[in-house]
Swiss-Prot record:
Its main location: cytoplasm. The lineage of its organism: Archaea, Methanobacteriati, Methanobacteriota, Methanomada group, Methanopyri. The gene is prf1. Belongs to the eukaryotic release factor 1 family. It comes from the Archaea. This is Peptide chain release factor subunit 1. One of its GO terms (cellular component) is cytoplasm.
Length: 409
């Protein structure tokens, strides 16, 4: 089963946090961002030049480490062969590991295309472009309008794609009075009605086939946007996706950006609302129903395939230690806060008594639960602690819970 977006983001964030803590003694950590259109053979050729130039580094130690890192880069790129679809991020260098040094080599295929070639040599890895991938990349629609024009666009992350611009034939104000004024007012309203219909149709064409459209922002100066939404111009399913209505001064492409800036809080809240609903559903079921579980019970229910959705707090920390008897195969899985606590559980096998249990594996606790859930066909949601519900879930349920498909008897 494919990982949920919350799990992907969690793992990506954890990887970046780990890489952020790595340091070299000198400027000897190499970072390379390779766009998909760049050939790896060209990058290897550039690395040969960098290797030659590195011979000018005065510090013997730094020179040795930089050249060693460049050699590793060239070896790894030769093994990859062709540039992946989204490009490649290469992080190589000698880092401090307590009192020792070790060579680190990470090749990362990013979730989105690398947009420019970057080569850096520093005392830390250059991770800013990677951090940008952690920003929300959900797709939203934007419509800004008044009676003169309307502009429609799509938001993907922080990138705005203008889709369509429409201009109207709605006349301006008229100074005639009496019968002429009333007749002219009717013409204006009729023209506005026709323009709203065109805008509604254009919005339908722009938004209805967008996969996973999270919501729509509507903006503009004055009351036109409200008149449009109050009428039957936007299809019902799209009208239900309108997250917020904002006042903006422009209705051209600059108005799209203005509307997005004003709607940022609403967009953030939309994702948090989804999370809040999920946690509330779990809490209600935990108190009043049978289809929720938490604590040690979750492990067994996961293995039985009874879990529909596994909820894991992003603040959950610790490790799962898998111990096994080399003689009879008896297995014991325990939870520890620190890795070095594992040795406390190395004891005589309680099943056969013929040998000591071996520490077979130590896994990050979140990775353990995510992998187990995926093996059993359960969905996984990583719950933030930014909301009151998320914080309560972590504190009251220790950051681990499950919504069940069924309750075993």
């Amino acid at each position: 089963m494919a990982e949920s977006s919350t799990v992907e983001r969690y793992r990506f964030r954890k990887m970046i946090e780990r890489l952020e803590n790595l340091r070299g003694q000198g400027t000897e950590l190499i970072t390379i961002y390779i766009p998909p259109e760049n050939r790896l053979s060209d990058v290897i050729a550039q690395m040969r030049e960098e290797y030659s130039q590195a011979s000018n580094i005065k510090s013997k130690r730094t020179r040795k480490n930089v050249q060693s890192a460049i050699e590793v880069v060239m070896q790894r790129l030769k093994m990859v062969g062709e540039t992946p679809e989204n490009g490649l991020v290469v992080l190589v260098g000698t880092v401090q590991d307590g009192t020792k040094e070790k060579m680190v080599a990470e090749l990362i295929e990013p979730p989105e295309p690398v947009d420019r070639f970057i080569y850096r040599c520093d005392s830390k890895f250059y991770l800013e472009p990677l951090k940008e991938y952690l920003e929300e990349k959900d797709v939203y629609g934007i419509l800004v309008m008044d009676r003169r024009e309307a502009t429609i666009g799509l938001v993907k992350g922080k990138r705005i794609e203008p889709v369509k611009r429409l201009t109207s034939d709605v006349p301006g104000k008229h100074k005639a009075g009496g019968q002429s004024q009333r007749r002219f007012d009717r013409l204006i309203e009729h023209a506005a009605h026709e323009f709203y219909q065109k805008v509604g149709e254009a919005a339908r064409e722009a938004f209805e086939d967008v996969k996973d459209l999270k919501g729509i922002i509507v903006g503009g100066p004055g009351p036109t946007k409200e008149e449009f939404l109050d009428g039957d111009y936007l299809p019902k399913d799209l009208k239900e996706k309108v997250l917020t209505v904002v006042d903006v001064g422009n209705t051209d492409e600059s108005g799209l950006r203005e509307a997005l800036n004003k709607a940022e809080e609403a967009l953030k809240e939309a994702e948090l609302v989804r999370e809040k609903r999920l946690v509330r559903k779990f809490m209600e079921e935990a108190v009043n129903g049978e289809l929720a579980a938490y604590g040690e019970e979750v492990d067994e229910l996961l293995k039985m395939g009874a879990v529909e959705v596994l909820l894991v707090s992003e603040d959950l920390e610790g490790y799962k230690v898998i111990l096994r008897c080399p003689e009879c195969g008896y297995e014991n899985i325990v939870t520890v806060k620190e890795k070095d606590e594992a040795k406390k559980y190395v004891e005589e096998c309680p099943e056969c008594g013929e040998a000591e249990l071996n520490v077979e594996e130590i896994k990050d606790i979140v990775d353990y639960y995510v992998e187990l859930a995926e093996q059993m066909g359960s969905n996984v949601e990583i719950i933030s602690t930014e909301t009151e519900e998320g914080a309560q879930f972590y504190n009251a349920f220790r950051g681990l819970g499950a919504l069940l498909r069924f309750r075993p008897k």
